[in-house]
A protein has these predicted regions:
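Bacterial N-terminal signal peptides
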Residues: 8-16
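Long, contiguous binding/interaction regions
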Residues: 22-128, 132-156
């Protein structure tokens, strides 16, 4: 009886360790996303691949107190595979007012929809805007579009 239970447990453990073809496809997709974005992200247990981009180039102050990039001044993009095999991306981009049009133009040119443009703070200097977006399609193509949008940040 114990031997049989151990045998079943061993089989279940081996089965749990197998990587499905879809997981391999996702791993390859995340590698392409990282290459297109120029930065690796983190894969969560629920299959969301997220890459963050702190805006350490911005010198923002709130009531004279410096706001570090890690305190709400980071752009991010999160990807997941949909049941139909396409990928979805959602994200948030931190920007100055002068960066809004170039970033939105780059996102829309790549078929990514802008779903919100607003601020997260009041009284900060300089004023910082946040653009939320979403898109569906090929993971690498979405990542290339986001890279083109991020490349608009920090230009003078």
């Amino acid at each position: 009886m114990i031997r049989r239970a151990l045998g079943v447990a061993a089989i279940l453990l081996c089965a749990a360790m197998l990587v499905t073809p879809q997981e391999k496809k996702d791993d390859a997709a995340w590698e392409k996303v990282a290459a297109a974005l120029g930065k690796k992200g983190d894969l969560s247990a629920d299959g969301v691949y997220k890459v963050t981009f702190p805006r350490s180039d911005l010198k923002v102050a709130m009531h004279g107190v410096p706001v570090p990039a890690g305190m709400g001044l980071a752009s991010w993009a999160a990807f997941t595979r949909m049941p139909d095999g396409k990928y979805m991306v959602m994200g948030d981009t931190v920007m100055l007012g002068a960066e809004v049009n170039p970033v939105s133009d780059a996102l829309r040119a790549g078929g990514i929809e802008i779903v919100a443009l607003h601020n997260h703070m009041l009284g900060e200097q300089p004023q910082v805007m946040f653009m939320h977006y979403q898109g569906e399609g090929d993971a690498e193509a979405l990542a290339r579009t986001i890279r083109r949008a991020l490349d608009q940040l920090g230009r003078k």
